[in-house]
């Protein structure tokens, strides 16, 4: 039996590795592009081929679910939820709830509230406070109402130790006051 050993030049080996790395990078980047602006069908097809990318973080530390939510791509975000996306990851910019409050994405926030997500998330507390504090600071009235309806803890104190009533006084906003009383 004759064994044939094929050898490759260093340039061919480098080219092969570059192709493998670039190919992985392209597929990896694709999930983030689809999260931002792809369709549900496109994401479904992608996840069938690359299910391990469901909770992969981008080079900026963001998940496909967070990107879809932030960009208002709610159909894709819902698909990612159905597939088991991690909804409790603490990002440098805060939690998923903080992103939804910031973008005023009531549709997804209501879905998460109904599914029992932790409304008293302390992710990035020093920077953003509890979600209820963040919503109050941004004057997201509908979000505040949704959080109250979802039984958010109203006894939590902000980063400076102020309770909800003190914050209501500080904000001096009749709409916020009305939501709590």
Positions of PLM-derived features:
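Ankyrin-repeat boundary/"N-cap" motif
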Residues: 29-31, 57-64, 90-97, 122-132, ...
